[in-house]
Each structure stands twice: as structure tokens, then as C-alpha cells.
Amino acid sequence: MNKKIHSLALLVNLGIYGVAQAQEPTDTPVSHDDTIVVTAAEQNLQAPGVSTITADEIRKNPVARDVSEIIRTMPGVNLTGNSTSGQRGNNRQIDIRGMGPENTLILIDGKPVSSRNSVRQGWRGERDTRGDTSWVPPEMIERIEVLRGPAAARYGNGAAGGVVNIITKKGSGEWHGSWDAYFNAPEHKEEGATKRTNFSLTGPLGDEFSFRLYGNLDKTQADAWDINQGHQSARAGTYATTLPAGREGVINKDINGVVRWDFAPLQSLELEAGYSRQGNLYAGDTQNTNSDAYTRSKYGDETNRLYRQNYSLTWNGGWDNGVTTSNWVQYEHTRNSRIPEGLAGGTEGKFNEKAAQDFVDIDLDDVMLHSEVNLPIDFLVNQTLTLGTEWNQQRMKDLSSNTQALTGTNTGGAIDGVSATDRSPYSKAEIFSLFAENNMELTDSTIVTPGLRFDHHSIVGNNWSPALNISQGLGDDFTLKMGIARAYKAPSLYQTNPNYILYSKGQGCYASAGGCYLQGNDDLKAETSINKEIGLEFKRDGWLAGVTWFRNDYRNKIEAGYVAVGQNAVGTDLYQWDNVPKAVVEGLEGSLNVPVSETVMWTNNITYMLKSENKTTGDRLSIIPEYTLNSTLSWQAREDLSMQTTFTWYGKQQPKKYNYKGQPAVGPETKEISPYSIVGLSATWDVTKNVSLTGGVDNLFDKRLWRAGNAQTTGDLAGANYIAGAGAYTYNEPGRTWYMSINTHF
């Protein structure tokens, strides 16, 4: 970033202006002279691509491992990997509208979370990570907002698919506390069980001060090392005894505190500090499902640990004239400590038994400054102008991922201009952004919200993101909502780092018969997507029905390159991370909520994918169901007793069409997952005004899937050593599981 832009970023972010990016909406709008001020951020929450999960819904349908389990029941949302490879198949993360987990921005109280970026991206773009949706205990969540399409694009870098904003429960001026516990019992003993307990305490610290404190401890056991025995893809020779792994376990420890100072009417300062530790319990997974005696010996051990620290200072202000502002700075440090892994061919992602250290650290520092101001304007029409800015810096020190040797055995020889063994472990990038939106109420039934965002990235340069959202009432019951926006995602610190190099002896190379390298590329372009949607909504007397068409025209998606950019002295081809010119995602979302009676509510949503295509290769972008139907029937049987039934129906899942060399998938690589459904039952009893119990069963009819391997064949099926491809059978669907939770509060 040049000095002028850098200086401007620092000055503006000291609080002169404000950014509307990623801000948690205030609990109540500011009113002045009987005029309600509605900001663009709040108006976007009314877009067709927005859903909300409440604390009560989480209480009545408690999650086991991760809140992604309930987020996936929203329209347009599924769980998948970053590609069609099936690698790390059981570490599926949130995918919104088929754009992949890397294009889903995770926020906690409006502030981005970036810990998963400390995990290395493999050749196919996968990370060995559980994602960033488990840093807050489910019982500490007030609500979760899921934004899709144009409504999400306003949040800038990483939101091309959508945004998940996890909003925590707040403190108050009165003393309150809670203690919660959850445990489950899988019917199949080879599946890992979960136990969780947490507490919270809020209260006053004098007339102007208050606080909130929570702590959490949970443990999920790893699936048995042989859970997929008998379901693995065909394997021969040196791979004959290998097995694809089940779901890994995890131990979470969290502590978080906030002190709030209400120093004047409508003015507050909040200081937050948090610490989390997540350690996995190894289930036997390797990137290429080629386990050996050493990897099997690590079963049940912690093989990677994430230590996350976050600190933030927030100033929220309002004035009698309706002007509001929100300004905050956040520092997030993640230490990713893990067993060293191989970086070449079949050993990529496999524990390196000969490494000099038992564990190596990857340290990621993320500093973010945000500022926003909302200005009500009474000129021609009622409108609220939002102006803002943002500055973000990421710095990483990776002592492991830049160590692929370029000389000696299992290498492809030296690369001109690149050190063979002593490459820098450091990388960094900065983004400076300016932001403007105007929420205009043209008539009582017509709202227009134009917006414009500018981002300057220190490596890939400038990006402009215009947006336009329109809401038009059609009589008393119908509303037509439309939006179009240009979304944006900068490349990762791995993709732009020339010191990050992977090696393959040939099978992983797109157009090379022999060995090849894949190198980071500091000449990449940012990914962009033109996101469009049109939705029609009907509301009357508790009924709600809607249908939305969406299309994302995806440009410059970053993948491992398809064309060698050079060759070294010994004939090894050099590939780089590269931009795919065009891809497209298109689909339909529908919803239907029916008040069956005063005590019974039936809610439904469906997502149908029309297109998911890389226009360069013709391949799919990810493995997701053709359609997903979520249905919940809720019955308030008594004032203190509620029951619900959940039903999810997944359409067929098709695997990748082509292998890594661009050749059509054949044989077992073409296996599809047929449609299947999952049914759940639960009941919640409010024992007293301070105690409630929830019990239930997930997957009532015990529909299970087993991970058979990665999507593509490793080796030659006609040869002596191979692992056959698994097609779409790259993850485990757990069977019938009983659970219970207790929630207490005072």
C-alpha cells in the first residue's frame, strides 16, 4: 500500500468517519420528531436473502458439535468443502448459495473472525479446519443472522457467498446468571459423543458500568478409527490397509468478558477480551486418505491446537438529531500449533514422522479498525446516509508451510530466483476501504438503497463494488424485492506468497506428464461476483410465503493453475495459483410458514440449485445437494411444554466431472449420493421460570452415510497400487443420536 493511502487509512479510522461494514444493528432504532431512522444495514436485514435464528430456536433444537448444524437449515445454506476434491471430507463448513466456505464471512457481534486463515490451503484449496463457527457456545448466542447474495456483498472481503453474524447475549444493569449443560448419546458406539457445560454472569459495576462474563468447556469424542471399515473405496498394494477416517473430535475451552461504560445518554464504550483453545482429537484423517502406522498411532491424540485471543474496543454513539455512529478496533491473534505435515504429492497433508519438531506454530495477527456514521436526511424524501471506512492488516508467520525442499529426494529441482531451503516464513496484506450507502424511502411502499464500496489491497490493487437494493410493496400482502451487487474476495496469504510451494510427481499436475510445482502468485486478481436476486413475498395473518431467484456470475475464482508458466532446468513444470475467468451459480429459494392453529406452526424452506459450473473446465464448483428441503412442525402443547418435529430432505449429490488432469471421471469416481432424509424429534419443558429441560433424538430413522475416500482415484486402477475414487461419498452422516440439555438462569 502506498504511503498516501496508508496515511489516509490511519487518519480516517481514528474515528473521523465510520464504516457500515459488518456492524451489528442497534437493538432499537433512534427516533426523533416521530421519524424512525432506518439505516441501510437494518434495511438489508429485510432483503429476501436474509434469515434469522433465535436463541429460543437454539434452545429447543440444541446443536452438538457446532452451530453450523442449525445454520445449515436456512435457505441457500449447506455444508461442503472448498472444492469437489472430497479432501478433508468430514471437515465440512458453511456454504451459501454454492459459493464455497471461503466465500462465507463469519462475524461475531459484527466483527470478522479469521482464525481459519491460519490453516494452510492444499493444492485443491482445502484447509484442515473446522471453520470459525464454534468460537461462541450455542447457549451464549442471542441470534444468528444469515445474509445471502446482494444483502451480504456490502460487507466487503470474503462475503461473495454470504455472511453469518453470530450475535451474543448482552449484559445489563441487573444481576443475571446462567448455567447450561448438554450431552448426547449416539446409538452407534463407533460415533463420537458430545458433552458441554457453560456459565454466564452479568451485572452492574456501579451506576454507569456493567459487565458480562461467560465460560465454556465441551468435548466431542472422535469417531472410531475403523468406522468406515467395509465402506471404503477399493484399495490395493501399498494402500490396501488404508482407511478413510470418520469425524475428528474436539475439546473447546472458552472464556470471554465485556465491560460496558454508559458515560452519557446514547453513548457507550465496550471493552472485550476473549481467549479460546480448540484442540482436535485425531480420528485418522490424511489429505489423501493414505494412512499408515505412524498416523494410526496418533488416533485420539491432539494433533492440532488453535489458540485464539481477541480484544476489541467499541464506541457506539447517538444524538438527539438522529445521527448515530459506531466505531471499533479489534485485535485477533491465532496460534495454530500442529504436527508438521508433508508438502509433496501423496504425502501432502500427512504427518511427517521425520520432522525435527513434534509441533510447529503458525501465528496469524489480524488488526481491524472500523468506523461508521449514519446521517438522517430530510430532503425530498426520508433517507439515511451511511458513510464509513475500514482498515485491515493480516500478518502471518508460518514455520511449516514454506519448507518444501527444492533439491534432493522427492523434489523437482531448483526454481530460479527461489531459495531451495531457507524461504521467509513471513507474509502480510492490508486492505483499506471506503463505504457509502443511502437508504431512501421514495414512498410508503418503495425503498431504494444504492451503495458503493472501494477496497484497496496492498497486493492485488483496487476494487469497486456498487450495489442497488429495491423493495416495492404490492398492496397490503405482497412485496417485491430485488438486488444486484458486485461482491469481492481478496486472495489468501498462501495464494499470494511465492515462498509457498507444493510439489507433485505428476498425478496432481493438470497438463504435465512429469513432476510439477505449484507456487504462490503475487500477481493474482481479486475474485469478484455479480450477485443478483429477485424475490416475491406474501404475508398475512401469520402466513408467509416467498420465492427468490438468485444468480452469481463469478469472475476470477482462484484455483491451482491449468497452464504451466515455466519449466526449470531439470524439466519440472511450474504452475501458480491462477484466476479462472468465469463461473456461475444459479438457483431458487422458497419459504412457506403456516399457522396451523393458535398453538401449531409449520415452517418450511427449500433450495434448488439450477447451475454450479466452472466455465473454463465445465466442472462443478462443489458437492452440494441438488435440492434441500427443511421443514419444522412446532406445537405449544401447554404453556410450559413445547414439542417439535424436524424433517430435512437432501437431493442427489453429484461428484466432480473431471479429474485433476481434465480427463472425464470414470468408474467409481462417478458415484452419486441418492436423495435421503433426516427426521428429528424434541420436546422442551419449562420446569420452573428459571429451569428448562430439552430432550430429543436426531436422525430418528437412522439414515447413515459412510466416507469411502476422496472423490478422485489415486494411482492407476489397472496397476498394483491405487485408491479408487469415492465420487460424492466423501463424508459421514451420523446415525440415530439421543440428547438432553438443561438450561438454568436467574
Regions found by a protein language model. Give the residues of each.
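Surface-exposed extracellular loop regions of Gram-negative outer-membrane beta-barrel proteins
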Residues: 279-281, 458-460, 476-532, 549-575, ...
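N-terminal periplasmic "start-of-domain" segments of outer-membrane beta-barrel proteins
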Residues: 32-64, 68, 93, 118-126
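A beta-strand signature from Gram-negative outer-membrane beta-barrel systems
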Residues: 128-180, 745
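Transmembrane beta-barrel wall of Gram-negative outer-membrane proteins
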Residues: 190-280, 307-309, 379
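Outer membrane beta-barrel strand-and-loop segments of large Gram-negative receptors
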Residues: 366-375, 423-427, 433, 521-525, ...
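C-terminal beta-signal and adjacent terminal beta-strands/loops
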Residues: 114-117, 555, 649-658, 684-746
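Extracytoplasmic beta-strand/coil segments of soluble accessory domains associated
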Residues: 68-116
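Gram-negative outer-membrane beta-barrel transporters
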Residues: 180, 441-445, 549-554, 565, ...
